[in-house]
Curated annotation (Swiss-Prot):
Residues annotated for substrate binding in this entry: 28, 261, 356, 383, 460, 468, 519
Protein name: Transketolase
Protein encoded by which gene: tkt
Sample GO molecular function, one term: metal ion binding
One GO term of the biological process aspect: DNA recombination
Record InterPro entries: THDP-binding, Transketo_C/PFOR_II, Transketolase-like_C_2, Transketolase-like_Pyr-bd, Transketolase_bac-like, Transketolase_BS, Transketolase_CS, Transketolase_fam
Keyword Oxidoreductase listed: no
Species classification: Bacteria, Bacillati, Bacillota, Bacilli, Bacillales
Organism whose genome encodes this protein: Staphylococcus epidermidis (strain ATCC 35984 / DSM 28319 / BCRC 17069 / CCUG 31568 / BM 3577 / RP62A)
An example Gene Ontology CC term for this record: cytosol
Pathway: Carbohydrate biosynthesis; Calvin cycle; Carbohydrate degradation; pentose phosphate pathway
Family, as annotated: Belongs to the transketolase family.
Keywords: Calcium, DNA recombination, Magnesium, Metal-binding, Thiamine pyrophosphate, Transferase
C-alpha cells in the first residue's frame, strides 16, 4: 500500500519544516520530524478535507493541539495546495500566514488557534460534541448530512495539562464516537526526559474514561498507523492512538533528545539530517513534483468526491425535508433567524428580578426562536438559570438534546464552547459562577484571540452573594475580563439591559461575550426601550438626569446603577445637577466616537463618582483625577448579602457622603 514515494513525501514534509525553522532561526523541529509519518498517513489516507474548500461544512476537522509543531501543519497545507511556498519561507515573520503557532482565521486550513497546551485537545472535544449534536438533530435515514471526524494530534504536554483530564472525562462519558486523538508519544519534554515528570499509564487512564486505546509501537510504520486509524473509525466512543515516535527523527546527534524540541537544528546538523533522509542538503524548500501529485491523487481527489456527493445528498435532503433543510442551512451560515429578538421578554417598572433569573427567562425564548442555541453549565444550571426547561438533556442516547451537563469541569467547558463556535452550526454558551471564571480564563482569552461567537454566563457577580463568603465573591474578576482585548464584558443593570446584552452576545460574530449577572433582585430602570437598546449596544448611556445645571456624574454598572439613581434623586431634592450613567460594556463604549463619549461623559464635568462592587481598577480612566471610585480593595466576607453590601459602603448615604467630599 505504501511505497518509496510515500517515504519521499514524508521526508519532504520533514525537510520543509526544518528549512522553515532554520530560516526563521526559531521554532520546534522535533515534533514535525517525529510525527510526520502519522500526519501524512492521516491526511493522504483518511482525512476528508480540502484546504481549497475550507468552508465545506461536513469536512473532517484536524486540530494540531501541539501547536508548537506548526511547521508540520504549514508543510502539509503547502503540499496539499493551500499555502504558498513563500509563506513557509516567511515562517514566524511579521505579516506572514505562518505565525509561530497556528492561528484561526489567519491561515486557511487552521481550524482553531493552538499553542497553549491542552486547549486544542479540549476544543476538539467541543467540535466532536457539535458534530454529535447536529447529527442527532438533522440526520435522517439515508441522509447522514452531518457525518465527519475530528482528528487531533496531541503531545505529551497536552496530556499532562489538567484540561486534558477534564475534557477526556467528558468525551468518554458522552461517548463521542467521531473523536480520534493521535498521541505523539516520544518520551521527551522541553526540559528533558519525560520520565522525570510523567509516568502515567496512558492505556489505563483513557480506558478508565471510557475511551478506546490503540498502541502503534513504531511511529514510522505507515501500515500500522493506517490500520490503527481504520480501527478507531470502526469503534464506538472516542479513541486515542498512542504512536511511539522519536523526536527529531533522522537527526544523527539530536534525535531522541530535548535539544531538538524547541530550537533549530543548525546548519551542520541540518545537512547531516538531510543525508539521513536521502535528500540533497544544497536544496532548500524543495518539493518534488511527485509529492504534490500524491496529495492531489489521494487527499484532494477524495475530498472533492466527498464534497460533490454531499452536495447532491443535501439537494435530495432539501426535497425530502424542506423545513429541516432550511434550518440546517441557516445553522451552517452562522446567522440568526430574522426578528428573533421580537420574541424576547420586556420588563415593566413593576418587575424586580435577579439578572440571572431574567437571563434564564430570555434563554427559554432564545432556545425556542434560535434553533442553533446550545449549551450548558458546569454543574450549576439551577443557580445559573441556564437550562432550557422544555428541552431534553444532551447525552449519547439523545444527542439532539439542548442541555449539556458539563459537570464540574469549567476549563474544559470553556474550551469546548470555543470548539463548538469554531466548528460552526451553533450559537454555544457556557455557565458558571463569576468567581469561577478564573478556572476557564485561558479559554476566555483564546476565544477573544480567535474572534469566536462564544457566550459565557457568569452569575453571582459580587459580594452580594453574602453567606458563601470571600471564596465565592468576585472582586478582581471584572477588571481581569475587561483587560482582555476583543471581549464584550456586559454587566446589565436590569432585565431590559439583560435582554439587549443577550442580543449583543449572539450578534457579535467575531467577539465573545461574558454576561455578568446578579443573584439578587434588581428593579427595572425607568428608561424607554429604544434608549436601553441603543445604550447597551454603545456600552454606556444616560439612565437618569436632573433638570439643574449638570454638576455631578455618577457612573455604575449592574446592581449599582439603581443605587446610583437613588442617590441622584436625593441630590435632585437638594437642588443639585446630576447625571447617572449605566456602563454595562466598556469594550463597546471604547469603540464609540469621541462625540458620543463626550455626550455621555462631558469633559467639563469633573466631579465624578464610579460605583461598582468590585476592584476599582480601570474606573479612574472615566472619573479622572478629581473623581472617586467606590469599589472594593479587599476580599469579601461571609454574612447575609444585604449586610455585606452595607458594610462595604454600597449605600445611598455613602454615595452622598462621597459626593459632598468632591
Amino acid at each position: 500500500m505504501f511505497n518509496e514515494k510515500d517515504q519521499l513525501a514524508i521526508d519532504t514534509i520533514r525537510a520543509l519544516s526544518i528549512d522553515a525553522i532554520e530560516k526563521a532561526n526559531s521554532g520546534h523541529p522535533g515534533l514535525p520530524m517525529g510525527a510526520a509519518p502519522m500526519a501524512y498517513t492521516l491526511w493522504t489516507r483518511h482525512l476528508n478535507f480540502n484546504p481549497q474548500s475550507k468552508d465545506f461544512f461536513n469536512r473532517d476537522r484536524f486540530i494540531l493541539s501541539a501547536g508548537h509543531g506548526s511547521a508540520l501543519l504549514y508543510s502539509l497545507l503547502h503540499v496539499s495546495g493551500s499555502l504558498e511556498l513563500e509563506e513557509l519561507k516567511q515562517f514566524r515573520q511579521w505579516g506572514s500566514k505562518t505565525p509561530g503557532h497556528p492561528e484561526y482565521r489567519h491561515t486557511d486550513g487552521v481550524e482553531v488557534t493552538t499553542g497553549p497546551l491542552g486547549q486544542g485537545f479540549a476544543m476538539s472535544v467541543g467540535m466532536a460534541l457539535a458534530e454529535s449534536h447536529l447529527a442527532g438533530k438533522f440526520n435522517k435515514d439515508q441522509f447522514d448530512i452531518v457525518n465527519h471526524y475530528t482528528y487531533v494530534l496531541a503531545s505529551d504536554g497536552d496530556l499532562m495539562e489538567g484540561i486534558s483530564h477534564e475534557a477526556a472525562s467528558f468525551a468518554g462519558h458522552n461517548q463521542l464516537d467521531k473523536l480520534i486523538v493521535l498521541y505523539d508519544s516520544n518520551d521527551i519534554s522541553l526540559d528533558g526526559d519525560l520520565d522525570k515528570s510523567f509516568s502515567e499509564d496512558t492505556k489505563q487512564r483513557f480506558e478508565a474514561y471510557g475511551w478506546n486505546y490503540i498502541l502503534v509501537e513504531n511511529g514510522n510504520d505507515l501500515d500500522e498507523i493506517d490500520n490503527a486509524i481504520t480501527q478507531a473509525k470502526s469503534q464506538q466512543g472516542p479513541t486515542i492512538i498512542e504512536v511511539k515516535t522519536i523526536i527529531g527523527f533522522g537527526s544523527p546527534n539530536k534525535a531522541g533528545s530535548n535539544g531538538v524540541h524547541g530550537a533549530p537544528l543548525g546548519e551542520e546538523e541540518r545537512a547531516l539530517t538531510f543525508k539521513e533522509y536521502g535528500l540533497d542538503p544544497e536544496k532548500r524548500f524543495n518539493v518534488p513534483e511527485d509529492v504534490y501529485e500524491i496529495f492531489k491523487s489521494t487527499m484532494l481527489k477524495r475530498a472533492n468526491e466527498n464534497e460533490e456527493a454531499w452536495n447532491n445528498m443535501l439537494k435530495n435532503y432539501s426535497e425530502a425535508y424542506p423545513e429541516l433543510a432550511e434550518e440546517f442551512k441557516l445553522a451552517m451560515s452562522g446567522k440568526l433567524p430574522n426578528n428573533y429578538a421580537d420574541a424576547l421578554p420586556e420588563y415593566d417598572l413593576n418587575h424586580s428580578g435577579a439578572s440571572r433569573a431574567d437571563s434564564g427567562e430570555i434563554i427559554q425564548k432564545l432556545s425556542e426562536f434560535v434553533p442553533s442555541f446550545f449549551g450548558g453549565s458546569a454543574d450549576l444550571a439551577g443557580s445559573n438559570k441556564s437550562n432550557v426547561k422544555e428541552a431534553k438533556d444532551y447525552n449519547k442516547d439523545t444527542p439532539e438534546g439542548k442541555n449539556v451537563w458539563f459537570g464540574v469541569r469549567e476549563f474544559a467547558m470553556g474550551a469546548a464552547i470555543n470548539g463548538m463556535a469554531a466548528h460552526g452550526g451553533l450559537h454555544p454558551y457556557a455557565a458558571t459562577f463569576f468567581v469561577f471564571s478564573d478556572y476557564l480564563k485561558p479559554a476566555l482569552r483564546l476565544s477573544s484571540i480567535m474572534g469566536l461567537n462564544s457566550t459565557f454566563i457568569f452569575t453571582h457577580d459580587s459580594i452580594a452573594v453574602g453567606e458563601d463568603g470571600p471564596t465565592h465573591e468576585p472582586i478582581e474578576q471584572l477588571a481581569g475580563l475587561r483587560a482582555i482585548p476583543n471581549m464584550n464584558v456586559i454587566r446589565p443593570a436590569d432585565g431590559n439591559e439583560t435582554r439587549v446584552a443577550w442580543e449583543v452576545a449572539l450578534e457579535s460574530e467575531q467577539t465573545p461575550t461574558s454576561l455578568v449577572l446578579t443573584r439578587q433582585n434588581l428593579p427595572t430602570l425607568d428608561v424607554d426601550k429604544q434608549t436601553v437598546e441603543n445604550g447597551v449596544r454603545k456600552g454606556a448611556y444616560i439612565v437618569f438626569e436632573t433638570e439643574q445645571q449638570l454638576e455631578y456624574l455618577l457612573l455604575a454598572s449592574g446592581s449599582e446603577v439603581n443605587l446610583a439613581v437613588e442617590a441622584a434623586k436625593e441630590l435632585e431634592q437638594q437642588g443639585k445637577g446630576v447625571r447617572v450613567i449605566s456602563m454595562p460594556n466598556w469594550y463597546a463604549f471604547e469603540q464609540q466616537s469621541s462625540e458620543y463619549k463626550e455626550s455621555i461623559l462631558p469633559s467639563d464635568v469633573t466631579k465624578r463618582i464610579a460605583i461598582e462592587m468590585a476592584s476599582p481598577l480601570g474606573w479612574h480612566k472615566y472619573v479622572g483625577i478629581e473623581g472617586k471610585v467606590i469599589g472594593i480593595n479587599s476580599f469579601g466576607a461571609s454574612a447575609p448579602g444585604d449586610l455585606v453590601v452595607e458594610k462595604y459602603g454600597f449605600t445611598k448615604e455613602n454615595i452622598l457622603k462621597q459626593v459632598r467630599s468632591l
